[in-house]
């Protein structure tokens, strides 16, 4: 027993008491051991927090390297509070600070590419980057949505969508667009009348009309007027949930929570539309919307496969590319991405178009003259694709508007691996890399007086040729916007049709020229307007 006691005492820790018997410990270590032994819970907490702050700062400084950015990061959150209320002036200052700049928000290290060449390099480097959106986006759009595909899988899926935006296809969608504009232009007149002729902020109305036009273009009349109105009203919640800085998780009664509920509603409605379209297309119905065109391609592909199985492929024309039969939910997801890609951008462009044409009666008069002429004096006459394409001045107005007030000012990507963007800077793997389009579109070396709205650049000038590499409104590279021709023709149809059916006045405020950032850009005062019926 004494031997056991002797052995046990021989292996007692030096921390068992404040004195260490015959162990000779330097006083510095003695002090540290004493402090650790007597440390309380809060001491440990503060020490851990200090270590985390130090790690956060060191990681930021190492990632930042030689590019422009704050010397130190606000612990953990970075400029998160500023990002909750994004200011265009703040973004512009960041872009102007250098070709590359950075910030760090929570765990995200963000590099901003501001020049034309830097932006183009990002757009054209699929080996290093892939498009990304906010953390909550897969929960809204669906984790298996095609927009999250990369490489060959993305290219192959995209090939099956290209046929939906050909000239022939776009002409089929025109009647649905005209119908929606006729309905909403009457609504604009009623709004002004109900307001007693006083100006009403129309930004939210433009969001609603562009959403309705998109729904009619994408899913036709498979969706009810009530459902279109509901989607148009609720899509604002989806946009708010997908802002660049937002909570990465869905908590009850947050923006993300409301956005998820709205997204689920849209997906459910579009799934119903897909089921109806399959029945109608299989019965030989005519194509009236994008969903019809895509499902018809699936049906034709299925017929060819069955003919091939029977050894009779020569009896059926082989579609190119061959598509599989997607289920209703997959179709719904894809159509939802079209709405996601178009809604905010076209809403922004529509708002600025109505504002700037009201401010520039010389421009509006020329648009009106061109459009009434092509309609042979009948303001209610629908347009064919040939007529729409012949509106050279109207299309120049749209082209310049998109340069002057580009709806999408930043396009977020994530680096798949370390990206040597310049000779002296490599963007770390996993960083968010954001090319901006605004600086390229306002480059004074390419565009004279770039801050001035001047449609003549594209009507009689050389902006198309000089700015061929600068016009990044729809991106470039493998992820360029599929619907860029559709978007521009749709906007030309809208403003041209409005010019012959309506008169409108912009009631300027001190904030009319200030830019509000809400996914895209809008006038800060939401564009107060009044409308009257055009009398010829």
From Swiss-Prot:
SUPFAM superfamilies: Cytochrome P450
GO molecular function: heme binding; iron ion binding; monooxygenase activity; oxidoreductase activity, acting on paired donors, with incorporation or reduction of molecular oxygen
Pfam families in the record: p450
Cystine pairings recorded for this chain: none
PROSITE patterns in the record: CYTOCHROME_P450
Lineage, uppermost ranks: Eukaryota, Fungi, Dikarya, Ascomycota, Pezizomycotina
Gene Ontology biological process terms, A to Z: sterol biosynthetic process
Membrane topology according to the record: Single-pass membrane protein
Note, other: In Fusarium, the biosynthesis pathway of the sterol precursors leading to the prevalent sterol ergosterol differs from yeast. The ringsystem of lanosterol in S.cerevisiae is firstly demethylised in three enzymatic steps leading to the intermediate zymosterol and secondly a methyl group is added to zymosterol by the sterol 24-C-methyltransferase to form fecosterol. In Fusarium, lanosterol is firstly transmethylated by the sterol 24-C-methyltransferase leading to the intermediate eburicol and secondly demethylated in three steps to form fecosterol.
Disruption phenotype: Leads to a severe decrease in conidiation and virulence when ERG5B is also deleted. The absence of both ERG5A and ERG5B seems not to affect the ergosterol production.
EC number: 1.14.19.41
Catalytic activity: 5-dehydroepisterol + NADPH + O2 + H(+) = ergosta-5,7,22,24(28)-tetraen-3beta-ol + NADP(+) + 2 H2O
UniProt superkingdom: Eukaryota
GO CC terms, sorted: endoplasmic reticulum membrane
Transmembrane segments: 41-61
Protein name: C-22 sterol desaturase ERG5A
């Amino acid at each position: 027993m004494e031997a056991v006691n002797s052995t046990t005492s021989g292996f007692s820790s030096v921390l068992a008491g404040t004195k260490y018997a015959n162990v000779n410990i330097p006083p510095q270590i003695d002090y540290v051991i004493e402090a650790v032994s007597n440390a309380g819970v809060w001491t440990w907490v503060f020490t851990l927090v200090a270590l985390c702050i130090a790690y956060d700062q060191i990681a930021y400084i190492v990632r930042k390297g030689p590019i422009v950015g704050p010397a130190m990061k606000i612990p953990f959150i970075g400029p998160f509070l500023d990002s909750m209320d994004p200011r265009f002036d703040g973004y512009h200052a960041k872009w102007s600070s250098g070709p590359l700049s950075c910030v760090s928000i929570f765990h995200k290290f963000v590099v901003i590419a501001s020049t034309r060449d830097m932006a183009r390099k990002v757009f054209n480097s699929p080996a290093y980057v892939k498009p990304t959106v906010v953390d909550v986006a897969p929960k809204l759009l669906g984790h298996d949505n095609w927009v999250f595909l990369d490489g060959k899988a993305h290219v192959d899926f995209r090939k099956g969508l290209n046929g939906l935006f050909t000239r022939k296809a776009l002409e089929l969608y025109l009647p649905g667009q005209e119908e929606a504009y006729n309905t909403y232009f009457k609504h604009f007149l009623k709004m002004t009348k109900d307001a007693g002729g006083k100006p009403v902020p129309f930004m939210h109305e433009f969001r609603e009309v562009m959403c309705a036009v998109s729904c009619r273009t994408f899913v036709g009349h498979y969706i009810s007027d009530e459902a279109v109105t509901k989607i148009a009203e609720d899509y604002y919640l989806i946009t708010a949930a997908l802002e660049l800085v937002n909570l990465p998780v869905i908590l009850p009664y947050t923006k993300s929570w409301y956005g998820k509920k709205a997204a689920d509603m849209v997906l459910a409605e579009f799934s119903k539309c897909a089921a109806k379209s399959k029945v109608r297309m299989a019965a030989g119905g005519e194509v009236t919307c994008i969903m019809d065109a895509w499902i018809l391609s699936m049906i034709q592909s299925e017929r060819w496969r069955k003919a091939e199985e029977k050894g009779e492929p020569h009896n059926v024309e082989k579609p190119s590319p061959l598509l599989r039969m997607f289920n209703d939910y997959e179709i719904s997801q894809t159509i939802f991405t079209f709405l996601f890609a178009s809604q905010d951008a076209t809403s922004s462009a529509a708002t600025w178009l109505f504002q700037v044409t009201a401010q520039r009666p010389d421009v509006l008069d020329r648009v009106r003259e061109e459009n009434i002429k092509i309609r042979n004096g009948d303001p209610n006459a629908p347009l064919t694709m040939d007529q729409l394409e012949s509106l050279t001045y109207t299309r120049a107005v749209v082209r310049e508007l998109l340069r002057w007030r580009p709806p999408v000012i930043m396009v977020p990507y994530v680096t798949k691996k370390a990206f040597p963007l310049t000779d002296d800077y490599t963007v770390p793997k996993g960083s968010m890399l954001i090319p901006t389009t605004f600086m390229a579109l306002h480059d004074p070396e390419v565009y004279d007086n770039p801050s001035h709205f001047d449609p003549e650049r594209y009507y009689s000038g050389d902006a198309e040729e000089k700015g061929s590499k600068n016009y990044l409104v729809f991106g470039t590279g493998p992820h360029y916007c599929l619907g860029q021709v559709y978007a521009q023709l749709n906007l030309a149809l809208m403003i041209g049709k409005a010019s012959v059916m309506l008169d409108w006045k912009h009631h300027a405020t001190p904030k009319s020229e200030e830019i509000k950032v809400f996914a895209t850009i809008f006038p800060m005062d939401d564009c107060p307007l009044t409308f009257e019926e055009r009398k010829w």
